Amino acid sequence: MRIVEEDEKNGVIELVPETLDDLWHLSHIIEEGDLLSARTTRRIQDTSGEKIRSDRGVKKTFYLGIRVETVSFHIYTGRLRATGVIERGPEDLVPMGSHHTLEVKLNTPLRIQKEHWSRWTLKRLRMAVRASKNLKAIILVMEDDVAELGLIRQYGVEYRGPITGHIPGKRIQQRDRGKLRREFYESIVESLQKYGDLETIIIAGPGFYKSDFYDYLMERYPEIAKKAVLENTGTGGRAGISEVLRKGTVERVSSEKRIASEIRNVNEFLEKLARDPDSVVYGKVEVMDAINMGAVEKLLVLDRVVSREDIEGYLDMVESMGGSVVLISSEHEGGKQLESLGGLAGILRFKIQ
């Protein structure tokens, strides 16, 4: 996520979503009553009555602002849509007061105007912006004995390499080929270890080397292997990196990792609930009472609860007392389990019963 402009006086923020996670965050930042503006495309028909044959109209792109009524995000298609009444736009093209659905698209500017930006909503927005500034992933493309690295950053791809193994043909003894291949793999590992805080490594390529290197990581560097996923490409080098980007693999894997982390947090709560019920609380009243006592070490909050319930002060209270707040999406099984518990659950630092 990138903020383009911020007009605090008028409650306007213009931003550019860059990942599927950004769209997910925006699905809970954009609320009913917001004025949402973006470029949109509509088919405009000739209403002059002069045409005899049916007129399918002409597609035109223009800036449109709607007063939001509903917001929907479909996690599997990655589509974020907001529906509402048109308040701003070219009056010769669209009737004011009619309904329209805006689709929020990646890498396309979007303006959100609110009567009041809550502290927690702004904090969530800043978190998304900070996350996008970090190194998102490394794409490692391997073809034969040549490897190329693509560091995926907010502004684009930063290339590193090539790393060359100089592994000769099969006429050389297998023992020597194995030694040279290990040296090649070690040089790649050395490059990867420079980015220790990285969460995602996509190992790609057209041939056998990518899976062989992954097996090598599993055996010798399991801490790196657990961050890695495999992807097929038709070619190596920078063209292979571009192919991975076109497939949307980085966005898909990043989203899957966020979901996996959320599910782990819900499972941690459920395990404690089964093993020692007094070490956790759930339900709105019980959780808020525990927060007031300073007993909540980790608070799990369903995304729908954040947008619908007046709990911002309680979220701030947990963090001010050294606890953590974890937002859980309602789009996966972990979120549905949390929803069945009332949408709020806390892991306690001390028992209150």
Curated annotation (Swiss-Prot):
Keywords: Cytoplasm, Endonuclease, Hydrolase, Metal-binding, Nuclease. It is an enzyme of class 3 (hydrolase). It comes from Methanothermobacter thermautotrophicus (strain ATCC 29096 / DSM 1053 / JCM 10044 / NBRC 100330 / Delta H) (Methanobacterium thermoautotrophicum). This is Protein pelota homolog. The gene is pelA. It comes from the Archaea. Its cofactor is a divalent metal cation. May function in recognizing stalled ribosomes, interact with stem-loop structures in stalled mRNA molecules, and effect endonucleolytic cleavage of the mRNA. May play a role in the release non-functional ribosomes and degradation of damaged mRNAs. Has endoribonuclease activity. Its EC number is 3.1.-.-. One of its GO terms (molecular function) is endonuclease activity. Belongs to the eukaryotic release factor 1 family. Pelota subfamily.
